[in-house]
């Protein structure tokens, strides 16, 4: 009886837990590869959405269309504020930092970015539209990318300009 009670409590705790990296990606790949039946898929999606919601994130998980990951990405800061379109494709060995958006072009939500292998996306980057980020590229902090990026490229912002104004006291 105690063992059953313990298993039930662990099950409930697992459902309401905030984010478990191993469990999240295990469920993600089972859904992505159609390895589970519909009722289990729905339960997995609910659990994944709860984990995402707690972290202010959305990794493109839907019942009929999900973003595609070749392999589990590296998330040094967890899910914190990461948004990925349902139609995005993410390559192998990709590193995604916090507050990154990989989204559609604002017109056609099926036109989402394709991220190559071994790409690093630093905090605050926004990658939008029907574009391709080539393999081994680096997207710098707070960069807004809306054009294709060739392989082996580094994308950075221009140096900030300082505009000095006289005070109007």
What annotation goes with each model-predicted range?
Residues 80:
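Aromatic- and Gly/Pro-rich donor/ligand-binding loops
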Residues 106-108, 167:
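Short acidic, glycine/proline-rich loop/turn micro-motifs
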Residues 59, 65, 70-71, 76-77, ...:
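Left-handed beta-helix
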Residues 1-61, 167-169:
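Terminal amphipathic alpha-helical/low-complexity segments used for targeting or macromolecular assembly
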Residues 155-169:
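Short, basic/aromatic-enriched C-terminal tail that caps enzymatic domains
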């Amino acid at each position: 009886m105690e063992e059953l009670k313990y298993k039930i409590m662990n099950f409930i705790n697992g459902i309401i837990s905030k984010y478990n990296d191993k469990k999240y990606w295990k469920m993600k790949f089972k859904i992505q590869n159609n390895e589970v039946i519909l009722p289990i898929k729905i339960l997995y999606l609910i659990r994944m959405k709860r984990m995402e919601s707690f972290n202010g994130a959305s990794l493109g998980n839907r019942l009929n269309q999900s973003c595609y990951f070749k392999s589990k990405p590296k998330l040094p800061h967890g899910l914190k504020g990461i948004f990925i379109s349902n139609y995005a494709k993410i390559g192998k060995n990709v590193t995604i930092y916090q507050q990154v958006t990989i989204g559609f072009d604002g017109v056609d939500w099926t036109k989402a970015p394709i991220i190559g292998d071994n790409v690093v996306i630093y905090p605050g980057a926004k990658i939008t539209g029907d574009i391709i980020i080539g393999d081994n590229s680096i997207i710098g902090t707070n960069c807004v990318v809306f054009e294709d990026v060739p392989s082996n490229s580094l994308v950075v912002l221009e140096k900030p300009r300082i505009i000095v104004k006289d005070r109007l006291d």
